[in-house]
Amino acid sequence: MENKEFIKEGFKRMFETSAFDEAFIRTMFASSYIQHVDGKTLVFEDFIRHLKALKEKTQSIKIHFKTLATEGEVVFSNHVVTVIMNDHSQTMIHIIAEFHIKEGKVYYCDELTSLIDGDAQNSDLGSTL
């Protein structure tokens, strides 16, 4: 599978299903994974806690990939995430992300997020723990 399909399909499985599947996350991301998002840095275990927190705070997450581009081991993504929170409110976040993939695993991400619509309290969903 090429890298951009790896990201697209992996993200659908991680985010667009209701279950928190830590085993799948561990197959997709390297244990050395580092994510820089909105001025914060998450290491692998922080990232797992982040994904678990998202599942606990939300009813559903849908990702609309506007652009996915690949150059070597790098996948650039411009996407919009629509989130239904547990209180039934909707949040939309625009995300620009650069993923680095080696040996079938994501090992690095540099990401910027911007709240498009929704409660300002949800503007940190990209890094919430």
Model-derived features: where do they sit?
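Generic, well-ordered alpha-helical segments
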Residues: 17, 39-46, 60
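Alpha-helix boundary/capping and short turn/kink residues
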Residues: 19, 41, 86-89
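A short gly/proline-enriched turn/hairpin at secondary-structure junctions
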Residues: 31-43, 54
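Short, hydrophobic secondary-structure boundary micro-motifs
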Residues: 22-27, 36-37, 63-64, 109-110
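Short acidic-aromatic low-complexity motifs
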Residues: 1-31
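A beta-strand edge to alpha-helix "cap/lid" segment located at domain peripheries
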Residues: 12, 49-129
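Generic alpha-helical structural signal
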Residues: 5-9, 45-48, 52
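Short amphipathic alpha-helical segments, especially helix-boundary/capping motifs
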Residues: 23-29, 40-41, 71-75, 129
